[in-house]
Regions:
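Function-determining sites in protein domains
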Residues: 11-14, 18-153
Length: 153
């Protein structure tokens, strides 16, 4: 009888350890899902760590026309940078597998070092890395078209 009670006790201890592991794994999975959900729904502000006066030039390639242009005018650079900085973006969908784009835009400091680069697809969409980011409109897409006409002619 003692042998049977010992086996039952060992079995109960094994089951208790198994339950602890299951609870621990479940908690870790829940925390990861919660963290990813919070991260996904957080707003993003592009160029938020950069002072507009530190950006000295912008290079743009129009994926629709194949034209590229650069501009260094302080007011134009400031307008584009401040416009992008003032727009809160939210992650939308994965950008994997999508082809083509509007404006590929790169920002450079006074030494010609690239600070940031991403794609502006429309007045409400930025594409960077794995995601499309959306806002309620207001990105300087039309202004970039005007600059393209000015600098490509």
């Amino acid at each position: 009888m003692n042998d049977l009670n010992g086996k039952k006790r060992i079995l109960q201890e094994v089951m208790a350890m198994k339950n602890k592991k299951i609870r621990l794994i479940s908690t870790i999975v829940f925390v990861l899902i919660a963290a990813l959900t919070i991260w996904y729904f957080m707003t993003t502000t592009f160029l938020s760590k950069d002072n507009p006066s530190d950006i000295k030039s912008i290079s743009v390639f129009d994926g629709n026309t194949g034209k590229s242009f650069d501009f260094r005018d302080t007011d134009e650079v400031r307008y584009v940078v401040e416009n992008i900085q003032s727009t809160k973006m939210k992650k939308d969908t994965l950008s994997i597998g999508y082809m083509g784009y509007g404006f590929r835009i790169s920002f450079f400091d006074e030494n010609g070092k690239k600070i940031e680069s991403f794609i502006i697809n429309s007045s409400d969409t930025i594409r960077k890395a794995l995601f499309f980011y959306r806002c309620d409109g207001g990105l300087c897409y039309d202004y970039l078209k005007e600059l393209e006409e000015k600098y490509s002619s």
